[in-house]
Amino acid sequence: MGLCGSKTQPMPSQTTTVATKARTKPINRDTVKSKQELRHKEKKDKKKKTQLKSTTVPVVQRKEGSKLTDTSDPSKNKVSPKEAARLAAEKRFQETNEKYNKGELGKKLAQERAKSHKTRLMEEAEKKHAERERENMIYD
């Protein structure tokens, strides 16, 4: 409990009154009239369902020997947006590669880009080893 004197809190010993709702008698569905109404509603629902079924079923004419899939579908040539973006990115990449790989310097840069980290380290180690051997050489 807080120390604030302006707030009053109900004590647990005080009783509170709860308003109860008046209960009503449930509806009796066993009467003859209600059964007839239910049957009548069911018949209407069945009629509606059969009408809906008959209107939504399209008439299909089949030819014997026809293929299930038609190879001349015009939508088959269309490409999804994701695929189109991928193709455009590949095209841009190839164009930039061709642009940079034309000259002699471009070819050397392409070779350097193609090398892995491991091959670069191996080349550096070979260069250092060659320098050490050159330094240790004895001239007569």
From Swiss-Prot:
Q: Where in the cell is it found?
A: Cytoplasm, Cytosol
Write down the superkingdom of origin: Eukaryota
Segments of skewed composition (Basic residues): 41-51
Lipid attachment locations (S-palmitoyl cysteine): C4
Extent of Polar residues compositional bias = 1-19
Q: Please tell me one Gene Ontology term that the record gives under cellular component.
A: cytosol
Pfam family of this protein, just one? SVIP
Quote the residue positions with lipidation, kind N-myristoyl glycine.
Answer: G2
Briefly state the modifications made to the protein after translation.
Myristoylated.
Q: What are the entry keywords?
A: Cytoplasm, Lipoprotein, Myristate, Palmitate
* Anything else known: Present with 2430 molecules/cell in log phase SD medium.
Can you name this protein? Answer: Uncharacterized protein YGL108C
Q: Which organism is it from?
A: Saccharomyces cerevisiae (strain ATCC 204508 / S288c)
